[in-house]
């Protein structure tokens, strides 16, 4: 389940936001003042407004105005993209591998510069009207060359559309896209220039691009000024309300959003001013993949607000495109929202209890689908983890930020993305400038202990911060099983009771080498094995298998997985001892106990083994279970997407400590108490320059670079075996827009203030600034 949270908007696009680092000009681009517009108050002598639709008992799941950076703008039948605006990010994957210098200035105006001599954008087309259609088209680009004697070759879906001379003065250039070149879905537009010059910041650029428009060929050249979509106070019949407004007499504002079950749209419709009959038609439409678009409302644009409550019907629960269309007149769309029937917001107990003892039981390499509580069909026996889950709050969709130990543990302990903590390769180290949970809690009076059987979680990689005791059994050449780890930790904990303590228990099972005890392996392999796999050598052998130096049969593959499954059941038994000891010590019902993992392991779901080199669900989806007696409900399942970096701010709240504003994650406690299953939340996995994984509601996007996108439906296809990107353009466009926003702001995103990239708050516009640069990305280099 999940929660949606809820000036000017720039043309085009449907799911975007953000910025990264520089100061502002954004204040001119996105004016946050409409957020302050009060509830509408009638002006004296105004005509009576239509009775508003009854939304009592409904809660807002998605506020279209707050999410205005996700708006895709069409004017007079054309998709309009302002490249100097935040919404440009959704068309260029946030600048990742699409070769743009974002958030720049050209001749005093916001623009994006071509990074070098070539760049690309991806523009959506559909067949539902009021925008570009499949077939031939007219592509209009407003730009100026930064180099003399410039030429640019333009390609649409890698087919040449023409080569033109580009002047040094800003000018619009119209190019005819040949018949049958535009198709439903995203269309790649690539610009390749002849030469580039040096620009500030040590970069080179061929041209400054200010606007892109795409329309059907029959429309010809667009008018000189297509205008922009605004989010502001609109006066209809003397009543002022916050609204989305598109100028002119033909517009379409589209959003690509994942609708919750039983979703409705609430919106007020009216023509600005006091004219008795502004004229024209207002239309609200919903479209989902594989189905014709459905009109939810069509009626005249009136001189009074007409408040609507529209049932999304079968589109609810799916990725959808919502269109707000004006034909023959200008429309103001007041307070447009996705709403659902739901009880009022809940609140935690008051005063909220805080805890003196915090224990994190980290299970290395534990896939969520190998625990019965997460996957009732699994053969793996985990009775103790399952019993704990039933006695705690379980987060059904926890996503790790890295797919091997170093970056993933680092995100959990710092509350930031890998691009910020920089611990992403064997030769890298945790940045000393990022927050660290042990230091935070030590400052608040906690005794802090690290007990780790993972060699990466050590001083060599920068983890020796804030611990009163810091033991790494790999580095100390000591036994590293969870039994020895807990025995050592218990000996340190016991004399300190009842003092405040935070203990991080980084167990190694079921990480390779896969060496389960015989009684646990026997549950999954009950016959002789005569193949090449040696349990004690399985870690080295996985590397040989990946490198093609060790050939394995289906029987060998099955044996490998049986070894892994046996390790998990062994871990489950050791966890039972940990819980029994906490109870015997008299602290179990006074403590926070958390079970998490840093990543999973793959067993040929996508052609390989081990971890650290993909962003599919078998590596990114892990257990997260929190027991906080008297605060978090027992047996509750939270179906919203959450990130492992949310753990650090959650621990701070549970301890009663002050939140650290440098942490990019957000405490999960408020989510538990406002968990109504309606709002999409974004969860990101980073594999350096290799891939990005994004989970939002039922979909996972795997992005390996421009034109290399895979999309999976986690409900219909939990093992991610069928890539549906080609025949789900609506779902793909929405996911791509969220990822573009998040990538551009990866180093500055703050979930506590901005929400998630799938559902932005008003605070984003006040503090984000214009899009900037990530700078040099940290290297990636996990187990291969």
Model-derived features with residue positions:
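Short histidine
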Residues: 166-176
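Extracellular ectodomain segments of secreted/surface proteins
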Residues: 111-131
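Bacterial N-terminal signal peptides that target proteins for export
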Residues: 1-10
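Catalytic domains that recognize anionic headgroups
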Residues: 21-24, 29-109, 144-147, 152, ...
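C-terminal motif of bacterial Sec signal peptides marking the signal peptidase cleavage site
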Residues: 17-19
């Amino acid at each position: 389940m999940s929660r949606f949270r809820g000036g000017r908007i720039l043309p085009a696009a449907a799911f975007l936001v953000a910025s990264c680092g520089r100061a502002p000009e954004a204040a001119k681009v996105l004016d946050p003042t409409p957020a302050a517009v009060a509830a509408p108050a009638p002006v004296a002598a105004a005509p009576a407004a239509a009775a508003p639709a009854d939304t009592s008992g409904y809660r807002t799941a998605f506020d279209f105005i707050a999410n205005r950076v996700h708006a895709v703008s069409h004017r007079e039948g054309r998709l309009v993209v302002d490249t100097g605006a935040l919404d440009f990010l959704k068309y260029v994957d946030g600048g990742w591998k699409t070769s743009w210098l974002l958030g720049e200035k050209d001749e005093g105006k916001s623009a994006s510069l071509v990074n070098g001599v070539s760049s690309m954008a991806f523009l959506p087309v559909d067949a539902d009207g009021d925008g570009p259609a499949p077939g031939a088209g007219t592509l209009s680009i407003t730009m100026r060359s930064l180099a003399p004697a410039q030429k640019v070759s333009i390609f649409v879906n890698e087919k040449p559309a023409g080569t033109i001379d580009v002047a040094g003065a800003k000018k619009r250039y119209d190019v005819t896209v040949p018949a049958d070149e535009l198709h439903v879905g995203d269309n790649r537009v690539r610009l390749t220039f002849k030469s580039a010059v040096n620009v500030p910041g040590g970069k080179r650029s061929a041209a400054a691009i200010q606007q892109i428009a795409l329309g059907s060929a029959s429309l010809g050249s667009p008018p000189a000024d297509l205008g922009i979509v605004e989010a502001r106070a609109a006066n209809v019949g003397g009543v002022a309300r916050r609204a989305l407004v598109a100028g002119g007499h033909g517009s379409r504002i589209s959003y690509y959003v994942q609708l919750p079950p039983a979703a409705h749209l609430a919106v007020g419709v009216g023509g600005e001013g006091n004219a008795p009959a502004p004229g024209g038609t207002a239309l609200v439409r919903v479209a989902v993949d594989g189905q014709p678009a459905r009109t939810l409302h069509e009626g005249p644009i009136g001189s009074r607000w007409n408040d609507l409550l529209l049932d999304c019907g079968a589109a609810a629960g799916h990725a959808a495109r919502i269109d707000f269309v004006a034909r023959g007149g200008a429309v103001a769309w007041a307070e447009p929202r996705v709403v659902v029937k739901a009880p009022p917001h809940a609140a935690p107990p008051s005063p909220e209890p805080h805890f003196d003892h915090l224990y994190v039981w980290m299970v290395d390499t534990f896939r969520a689908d190998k625990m019965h509580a997460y996957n009732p069909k699994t053969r793996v026996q985990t009775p103790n983890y399952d019993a704990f889950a039933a006695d705690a709050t379980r987060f059904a969709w926890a996503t790790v930020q890295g797919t091997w130990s170093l970056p993933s543990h680092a995100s959990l302990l710092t509350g930031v993305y890998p691009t910020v903590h920089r611990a992403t390769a064997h030769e890298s180290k945790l940045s000393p400038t990022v927050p660290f949970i042990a230091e935070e809690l030590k400052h608040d009076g906690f005794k802090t202990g690290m007990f780790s059987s993972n060699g990466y979680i050590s001083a060599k990689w920068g983890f020796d911060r804030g611990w009163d005791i810091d033991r790494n059994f790999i580095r100390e050449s000591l036994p590293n099983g969870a039994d020895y780890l807990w025995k050592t930790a218990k000996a340190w904990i016991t004399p300190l009771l009842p003092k405040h303590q935070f203990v991080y228990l980084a167990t190694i099972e079921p990480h390779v080498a896969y060496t389960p005890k015989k009684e646990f392996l026997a549950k999954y392999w009950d016959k002789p094995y005569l193949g090449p796999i040696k349990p004690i050598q399985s870690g080295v052998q996985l590397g040989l298998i990946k490198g093609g130096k060790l050939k394995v049969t289906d029987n060998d593959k099955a044996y490998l997985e049986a070894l892994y499954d046996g390790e998990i059941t062994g871990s489950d038994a050791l966890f039972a001892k940990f819980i029994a000891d906490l109870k015997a010590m008299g602290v179990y019902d006074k403590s926070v106990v958390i079970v998490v993992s840093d990543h999973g392991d793959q067993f040929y779901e996508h052609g390989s083994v081990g971890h650290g080199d993909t962003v599919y669900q078998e590596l990114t989806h892990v257990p997260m279970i929190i027991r906080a007696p008297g605060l978090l409900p027992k047996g509750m399942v939270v179906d919203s997407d959450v990130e492992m970096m949310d753990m650090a701010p959650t621990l701070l709240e549970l301890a009663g400590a002050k939140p650290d504003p440098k942490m990019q994650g957000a405490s999960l406690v408020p989510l538990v108490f406002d968990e109504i299953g309606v709002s999409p939340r974004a969860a990101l996995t980073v594999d350096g320059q290799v891939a990005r994984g994004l989970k939002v509601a039922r979909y996972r996007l795997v992005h390996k670079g421009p034109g290399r996108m895979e999309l999976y439906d986690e409900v219909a296809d939990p093992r991610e075996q069928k890539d549906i990107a080609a025949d789900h353009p609506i779902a793909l466009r929405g996911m791509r827009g969220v990822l573009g926003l998040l990538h551009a702001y990866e180093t500055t995103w703050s979930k506590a203030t901005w929400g998630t990239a799938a559902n932005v708050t008003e605070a984003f516009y006040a503090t984000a600034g214009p899009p900037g640069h990530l700078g040099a990305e940290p290297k990636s280099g996990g187990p291969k």
